[in-house]
Design a protein with these regions (language model features):
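Protein kinase-like catalytic core scaffold
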Residues: 202, 250, 262-266
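ATP-binding N-terminal substructure of ATP-dependent carboxylate-amine bond-forming enzymes
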Residues: 1-111, 115, 130, 371
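Peripheral (often C-terminal) accessory segments that flank ATP-dependent C-N-forming ligase machineries
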Residues: 292-384
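Active-site nucleotide/adenylate-binding loops and adjacent lid/helix of ATP-dependent enzymes
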Residues: 102-190, 194-240, 373
Length: 384
């Protein structure tokens, strides 16, 4: 492709915080960004050079985006693949619809991962009540996960018996699900990679992820794992991107089982929450890389120059008095820390469990970054 020079328009499907950070990164390179999202005043739309408020399948809005932009990308995986296919007829689209379609459906995703020989935990597909009734006892205790639209712990139910599986399947609306055996977790880690048209690949350092109530709470980079495990995780992530013939930024999440065995948990065909630290701690952030690949210019260096700990800021912080009236958290306490970088997403309505921002704590050592993160969490009232 002919590279798009700064000044060109880039299109974005999705208006959330990932899109907001993509806009800022692309604009810092000199590109202009048009965002298509159904919501008015979305986080990305509020900072974009142009905001198109319409359904993702609105033909007029898609035509306007295609007429304005030299390429388009997505900020989350549940954009209808039909919208990507429409745009791909007349412009460059990264990632491609086929890759996104695999990641949109947990059954397709698990089948793809296992079918290509990558390590994955035991699972079974549930498509009917009979499948649930005949659930393999070897997969219990386990978790029933909806095939589509599950994220941040949503669409997941823990089960211990076949009767639990039957109830969970019914609670999911009797729609296709995956039953996964519970893994004896040692850690959860992730790797963000980027891949160009010619197959060139880069990867950021492995990140260690700590969750609370199914939502990412803290990411530690680099992960506190053996060098061999980190290299294996990076190799698997890059091999998965190649198997998908992927274009753009991709995150692979892993479970670390006993014996440092890596199991692929899921794929996110986009920048990822666990990669937000790259904005402040790496030569090139995941969002700048997304813009670079879309524009067809050379990828930037992924070197991490500073240890980092990222802490998510959820809407719960606004409701610490146990009431229903939100109160702005004490951001001045965060800004008093010279090695902390505050990022708020411009969301107008705080809600419990909603990602409202993050803070990245930097340090000369990982222990120093961890100490700053612990202090900020304590000052804001975030559980340790």
């Amino acid at each position: 492709m002919v590279p798009l020079a700064p000044g060109a328009w880039l299109g974005l499907l999705g208006g959330g915080q990932l899109g907001r950070m993509f806009c800022m990164a692309a604009q810092s390179l000199g590109y202009r960004v048009a965002v298509l999202d159904p919501a008015d005043e979305s986080p990305a739309g509020s900072v974009a050079d142009r905001s198109l408020v319409a359904d993702y399948l609105d033909s007029g809005a898609l035509a306007a985006l295609a007429g304005l932009c030299g390429g388009a990308t997505t900020e989350f995986e549940n954009v209808p693949s039909a919208a990507l296919e429409y745009l791909a007829r007349s412009m460059r689209v990264t990632p491609g619809a086929a890759s996104v379609a695999i990641a949109q459906d947990r059954i397709s995703e698990k089948t793809f991962i296992a079918g290509h020989g990558f390590p994955v935990g035991p699972f079974a597909v549930l498509r009917s009540p009979d499948d649930a009734k005949r659930a393999d006892p070897a997969l219990l205790p386990g978790i029933v996960k909806s095939a589509r639209l599950g994220y941040d712990g949503k669409g997941q139910i823990r089960v211990a018996t076949r009767e639990d599986v039957v109830r969970a399947f019914a609670a999911m609306g009797a729609k296709a699900c995956v039953l996964e055996r519970l893994v004896d977790l040692r850690r959860e880690v992730s790797v963000v990679v980027a891949r160009e048209d010619d197959g060139s690949l880069v990867a950021w350092p492995v990140t260690e992820n700590l969750h609370r109530n199914g939502i990412l709470d803290t990411s530690i980079a680099p992960a506190r794992v053996a060098a061999g495990l980190a290299e294996q995780a990076r190799s698997i992530a890059m091999a998965l991107a190649t198997a998908l013939d992927y274009r753009g930024v991709l995150c692979v999440e892993f479970f670390v089982a006993p014996g440092d065995a890596l199991l692929v948990n899921e794929i996110a065909p986009r920048p990822h929450n666990s990669g937000h630290y790259t904005i402040d701690a790496c030569v090139t952030s995941q969002f700048e890389q997304q813009a670079r690949v879309l524009a067809g210019v050379p990828m930037g260096d992924t070197f991490q120059h500073t240890p980092a700990v990222m802490v998510n800021l959820l809407g719960d912080l606004w409701f610490q008095d146990a009431g229903d009236v939100p109160h702005e958290p004490a951001w001045l306490r965060v800004l008093a820390h010279p090695h902390a970088k505050l990022h708020l997403y411009g969301k107008r309505e705080p809600r419990r469990g909603r990602k409202m921002g993050h803070v990245t704590c930097l340090g000369a050592t990982l222990d120093a970054a961890l100490a700053t993160a612990a202090t900020i969490k304590r000052e804001l009232g975030i559980p340790a």
